[in-house]
């Protein structure tokens, strides 16, 4: 069942060439952080190109609950009048973060070092995800948390009245955990240090520096060492949100597997901590080029051009690349189905605790559509069948996971028989215009109204 109402089954069928321009929404990671850092700064932050998916709208609502003034001016233009570091008010009601693991974890961090309490909940998917990986480091600051068995939502977090700075080594690569600790460190005196053995997306570090925080990043023997000086006065900013590479993945990958396709995806953020999928696709032999490369707001940006690539070859994806493409493995596994040979993906334990167990969700759906998959605790291997040889014909469970739903709809565009997703409703959390955008390119996606 969809997180916001009755299930919305969709079926995707083989189509003619995908052509044209795919203007995907603003980056989800940067959209969340823009609202949260705007709320923690002094003055008015103006945001252009904000992703208006449900996840980000839930974060905007949460920032209002903590006392910030958040205004939607229309057309992706938003403003946030912040309350300053340490200025969060105690919310009157429960904070509902919907489907968003990013939203709830970052907000928990942002409030954990203020002398207030907040209760968090979400949809069925989010309430099943473990939160201890965030609440454990927040406890080091002095915050307390009370949730359901297994550290799950609903959960009340009691912020530290007298927070202390923390040095924390992130055990499993996670930008959400790292960011929660850094946001908590904002209102702790002294220096908070985060050490990550493998680099994860660095939007939080870049944006904290942009808002005026004293933050340094160094490479050491133990990994990346991020040092933040607490209790700064963050200054409001003007933010232009680049378009989301995780959303761009879907029209790009669809173009690679649908014969005759030629799709341009303009203005995509190519932060090196996010661009692992595109590097991997090129190594597989994808006809994927970067055009008009530039820097906007401190982030590298380019227009992506993807063309049908009939001779894709399976590869072993370097485990060190996992953090830079963790959300893209589901759709990569779809492309791998149309390649020749094995695509080996290791070091991806994080996929087991996303919106769904993404390895299990994709493996079962791929097998149902005639593709051989092997998997283990932190790895999986997809044996490609080559262009034109993927059967399709199955109904796949989305497990309330937007990326699983979109991945199987992309698959159906090039399989012999249509592919159905049991509930595509969660797509609205990150890519509300997915269906019309893909249809405009030439995809055949139908809602199954029973």
Curated annotation (Swiss-Prot):
Transmembrane segments: none annotated. Monomer. GO terms for molecular function: 3-phosphoshikimate 1-carboxyvinyltransferase activity. Belongs to the EPSP synthase family. GO terms for biological process: amino acid biosynthetic process; aromatic amino acid family biosynthetic process; chorismate biosynthetic process. GO terms for cellular component: cytoplasm. Its main location: cytoplasm. Keywords: Amino-acid biosynthesis, Aromatic amino acid biosynthesis, Cytoplasm, Transferase. It is found in: Cytoplasm. Disulfide bonds: none annotated. Phosphoenolpyruvate binds at residues 28, 101, 129, 176, 358, 403. It holds the Pfam family EPSP_synthase. 3-phosphoshikimate binds at residues 28-29, 33, 174, 176, 327, 354. The active site is at residue 327. The keyword Lyase does not apply. This is 3-phosphoshikimate 1-carboxyvinyltransferase.
């Amino acid at each position: 069942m969809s997180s916001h109402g009755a299930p919305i089954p969709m079926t995707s069928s083989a189509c003619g060439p995908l052509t044209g321009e795919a203007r995907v929404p603003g980056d989800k990671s940067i959209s969340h952080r823009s609202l949260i850092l705007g709320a923690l700064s002094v003055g008015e932050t103006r945001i252009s190109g904000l992703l208006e998916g449900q996840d980000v709208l839930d974060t905007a609502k949460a920032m209002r609950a903590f006392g910030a003034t958040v205004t939607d001016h229309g057309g992706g233009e938003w403003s946030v009048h912040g309350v300053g570091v340490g200025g969060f008010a105690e919310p009157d009601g429960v904070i509902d973060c919907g489907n968003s693991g990013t939203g709830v974890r970052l907000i928990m961090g942002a409030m954990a070092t203020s002398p207030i309490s907040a209760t968090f909940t979400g949809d069925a998917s989010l309430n099943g995800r473990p939160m201890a990986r965030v609440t454990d480091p927040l406890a080091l600051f002095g915050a307390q948390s009370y949730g359901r068995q297994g550290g799950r939502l609903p959960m009340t977090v009691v912020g530290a009245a007298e927070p202390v700075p923390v040095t924390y080594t992130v055990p499993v690569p996670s930008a959400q955990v790292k960011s929660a600790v850094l946001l908590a460190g904002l209102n702790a005196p002294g220096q908070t240090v985060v050490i990550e053995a493998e680099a994860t997306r660095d939007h939080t570090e870049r944006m904290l520096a942009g808002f005026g925080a004293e933050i340094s990043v160094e490479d050491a023997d133990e990994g990346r060492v991020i040092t933040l000086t607490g209790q700064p006065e963050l200054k409001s900013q003007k933010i232009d949100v680049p378009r989301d590479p995780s959303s761009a993945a879907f029209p790009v990958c669809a173009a690679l597997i649908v014969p005759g396709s030629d799709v341009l995806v303009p203005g995509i953020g190519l932060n090196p901590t996010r661009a692992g999928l595109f590097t991997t696709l090129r190594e597989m032999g994808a006809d994927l080029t970067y055009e008009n490369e530039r820097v906007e707001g401190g982030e590298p940006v380019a227009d992506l051009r993807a063309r049908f690539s009939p001779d894709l070859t399976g590869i072993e994806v370097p485990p060190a690349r996992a953090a830079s493409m963790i959300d893209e493995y589901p759709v990569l596994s779809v492309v791998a189905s149309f390649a020749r040979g094995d695509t080996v993906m290791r070091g991806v334990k994080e996929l087991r605790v996303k919106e769904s167990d993404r390895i299990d969700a994709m493996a079962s759906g791929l097998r149902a559509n005639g593709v051989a998959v092997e998997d283990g605790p932190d790895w999986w291997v997809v044996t490609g069948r080559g262009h034109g040889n993927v059967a399709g014909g199955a109904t796949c469970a989305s497990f309330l996971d937007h990326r699983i739903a979109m991945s199987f709809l992309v698959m159906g565009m090039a399989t012999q028989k249509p592919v159905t997703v049991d509930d595509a409703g969660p797509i609205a959390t990150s890519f509300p215009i997915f269906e019309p955008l893909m249809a405009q390119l030439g995809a055949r996606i139908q809602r199954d109204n029973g």
